[in-house]
Amino acid sequence: MAHKKAGGSTRNGRDSESKRLGVKRFGGESVLAGNIIVRQRGTKFHAGVNVGIGRDHTLFALTDGKVKFEVKGPQNRKFISIED
């Protein structure tokens, strides 16, 4: 007779890789055209002046300049712009 119960398989033990989301360039920082400013899921931050938006909602600089974060509109949305 076995003295130990047979070990069953567990259904846990998996974890996905982190996606490295978040702000990459902060307010006042100088950026070059093409620099990624924010990696995000959905539009937590919206594209302002001189900022483009990628297929995965990544915000990037369209021109050289300084990053500016601002809150505006009736919904208090966060916009990111590039100032010269």
Curated annotation (Swiss-Prot):
One Pfam family from the record: Ribosomal_L27
Database matches in InterPro entries: Ribosomal_bL27, Ribosomal_bL27_CS
GO cellular component: cytosolic large ribosomal subunit
An example molecular function term from Gene Ontology annotations: structural constituent of ribosome
Region (Disordered): 1-22
This protein's UniProt keywords: Ribonucleoprotein, Ribosomal protein
Biological processes annotated in GO: translation
Family statement: Belongs to the bacterial ribosomal protein bL27 family.
Name of the featured protein: Large ribosomal subunit protein bL27
UniProt organism field: Shewanella pealeana (strain ATCC 700345 / ANG-SQ1)
